[in-house]
Amino acid sequence: MVMAYFVENFWGEKNSGFDVLYHNMKHGQISTKELADFVRERATIEEAYSRSMTKLAKSASNYSQLGTFAPVWDVFKTSTEKLANCHLDLVRKLQELIKEVQKYGEEQVKSHKKTKEEVAGTLEAVQTIQSITQALQKSKENYNAKCVEQERLKKEGATQREIEKAAVKSKKATDTYKLYVEKYALAKADFEQKMTETAQKFQDIEETHLIHIKEIIGSLSNAIKEIHLQIGQVHEEFINNMANTTVESLIQKFAESKGTGKERPGLIEFEECDTASAVEGIKPRKRKTFALPGIIKKEKDAESVECPDADSLNIPDVDEEGYSIKPETNQNDTKENHFYSSSDSDSEDEEPKKYRIEIKPMHPNNSHHTMASLDELKVSIGNITLSPAISRHSPVQMNRNLSNEELTKSKPSAPPNEKGTSDLLAWDPLFGPSLDSSSSSSLTSSSSARPTTPLSVGTIVPPPRPASRPKLTSGKLSGINEIPRPFSPPVTSNTSPPPAAPLARAESSSSISSSASLSAANTPTVGVSRGPSPVSLGNQDTLPVAVALTESVNAYFKGADPTKCIVKITGDMTMSFPSGIIKVFTSNPTPAVLCFRVKNISRLEQILPNAQLVFSDPSQCDSNTKDFWMNMQAVTVYLKKLSEQNPAASYYNVDVLKYQVSSNGIQSTPLNLATYWKCSASTTDLRVDYKYNPEAMVAPSVLSNIQVVVPVDGGVTNMQSLPPAIWNAEQMKAFWKLSSISEKSENGGSGSLRAKFDLSEGPSKPTTLAVQFLSEGSTLSGVDFELVGTGYRLSLIKKRFATGRYLADC
């Protein structure tokens, strides 16, 4: 049992012990959250280490398997994989521990709320005794003053009337003083009783909290200890495996797996050369009865190149240039003495003679030399041109042997290359834009001097189709990520094709395709402050700030089924400071802290403040508001940095926080969509139904600048639409633009877009359409902003929401 430390040590003259103990209890929630964050960070580190070890184990299997050391890599791989698994097991245990800490944190919040209600009486007693103490002190001072005044009048010989009047006041002050003394006694007794009970309650809560936290830490240390024991076992196993992998065993494995045989070469003795038998043995090998002369010659050439026998090498006769020749007498004797000779063998023997006669005239001027010089031989060898043997290779081998330079050259004498080039150029460049923009194609990057640019290719082949079309035809939902965002600013370069979306030119003036572009678009609006001139700000003025709340709604509609609608709504808050405020901040070492409150946050799933500039109280219990305060030192440094980058700016924007709004499917979309396609070989009918949905907004607001773009393929030759649309033949897209939609619109904001397309290369394939709109003056979540405290005033607050990726499919 722990001693009653809280009961004995939290009294004091100002009776502020209750406040200290209550805030200490609230700090327990912060400790629990920070412990969960610490364990989560440790789990992240362990997971990253496990992945790195797994990658290392895989790389070990890719190392060289040659040599006697190769089997050792298997030992490394096995050990590394086991280490990775150990750390992965620790990650699982830490994740379970995080869930336990989070569950305890939720229970802790509920317990603290209940305790707050229970100690409400003590809080009243504290406030009562504090107020009575102050009143008692004042009544005592008044009583002393009246008594002194009465005695002074008596001593100075004042009139009886003045003395009586002073006596009445003194008696009244005495009664008041006695009354507060009695009240203080009662309040003191009540305060001591309740404070004793409350202090003990707070101590019990802290004891329970610390015991639970220590149990969690014990579980953490045990998990780490178990994993370290497993890691130790893995290391022991690795040491044993390496001890068993001896040098002898490695050499033995290599000898058994890579050995070439155990038979040693036999003994060879010197044998005398029998010239007669050697010459006789040549003819039977050459002679083939009923054989064709050409075939026999090829076989004889192959034999002379691939396996020259020792007998032929022993012929000593050479000509004047050093070439070996056969004696004519031997050849004649062979013809006469052997019945194998025939017209076939004669033709075979005559062909080498012809080659000998043709070789000699190659050096007519150098007949007096006995041997060609080394330089002349090099020149002769260098001038030899091999016959075109590429025709014998398969097409795959030919392409593999060709260099990148050969692929890019255009030679009239190389028909195969020209054919290959024409085949490549004839391909439909479905993925051309992505390759050109990324510049990551292997053929493009392999040669920096490639003469054929994407623009020249485009002059040969038909215009490229949109890069999104192949993706959408194979799978609608997977194609969302592939379709280019039609409302974002076009990013063009010298080598990339023109933008695929027809809205790309119009959107530079109204870029609202993402939350980032919304923030950029808001910058001029937020900068227009109604506050004082930036240069006239003084240290004593209330400093003006402006705020922009911007939300982006992303949606994907699948046909007319509302259950398949996917919605995500995000928002961000930007704060704008006048440039003159920087001088105020830098001249004042302790500027007033800027505190603000975000209201109506019940519909928010997550709030992410700028961790470098903004602080918040995680123990705040109000579910509809949240208070924040800014790190003024960090804000000053950040504003000074912005000022150095752009000294001429009148205002500087700071990203304060981002948030995500909870969504309820199609009910959270301000404009519901449904698309219908009817495709035939000659025509395509399209209908897009839209409906204004005020329930998605806290306060119904007007949707303005509505733009709809639909890609249509199949070779559109004519378009009929209602309301009128614009057809971009180059981009193959239809484009509608509506001024505004609201509850006051026709049919309550419901309507249809219809179009009929005549085709020359039908049928068309249904594609994904994109929609853009915006609304000024309100947000979907209803989030609001207000300043808390003094020193600052809100000069302007700007609210808007707009579309991010707002897509519809059939």
UniProtKB/Swiss-Prot annotation:
Post-translational modification: Ubiquitinated. Mainly undergoes monoubiquitination but also polyubiquitination.
Note: Deforms liposomes into a range of tubule diameters from 20 to 130 nm in vitro.
Pfam families attached to this UniProt entry: GMIP-like_FCH, muHD
Functional note: Functions in an early step of clathrin-mediated endocytosis. Has both a membrane binding/bending activity and the ability to recruit proteins essential to the formation of functional clathrin-coated pits. Has a lipid-binding activity with a preference for membranes enriched in phosphatidylserine and phosphoinositides (Pi(4,5) biphosphate) like the plasma membrane. Its membrane-bending activity might be important for the subsequent action of clathrin and adaptors in the formation of clathrin-coated vesicles.
Subunit-level organization: Homodimer; disulfide-linked. May form homotetramer. Interacts with AP2A1. Interacts with EPS15, EPS15R, ITSN1 and ITSN2; recruit those scaffolding proteins which in turn may interact with the adaptor protein complex AP-2 at the plasma membrane. Interacts with DAB2 (via DPF motifs); mediates LDL receptor/LDLR endocytosis.
Membrane-related topology note: Peripheral membrane protein
MHD domain mapped to chain residues: 542-809
Location (main, coarse): membrane
SUPFAM superfamilies per record: BAR/IMD domain-like
Protein name: F-BAR domain only protein 2
GO molecular function: identical protein binding; phosphatidylinositol binding; phosphatidylinositol-4,5-bisphosphate binding; phosphatidylserine binding
Spans annotated as Disordered: 301-352, 404-537
Modification Phosphoserine occurs at: S312, S387, S394, S403, S488, S493, S496, S508, S510, S511, S533
Upper taxonomic lineage: Eukaryota, Metazoa, Chordata, Craniata, Vertebrata
Annotated family: Belongs to the FCHO family.
Cell compartment(s), UniProt: Membrane, Clathrin-coated pit
Domain F-BAR intervals: 3-250
PROSITE patterns xref list: F_BAR, MHD
Keywords carried by this UniProt record: Coated pit, Coiled coil, Disulfide bond, Endocytosis, Isopeptide bond, Membrane, Phosphoprotein, Ubl conjugation
GO BP annotations, alphabetical order: clathrin coat assembly; clathrin-dependent endocytosis; membrane invagination; protein localization to plasma membrane; synaptic vesicle endocytosis
Domain of life of the native organism: Eukaryota
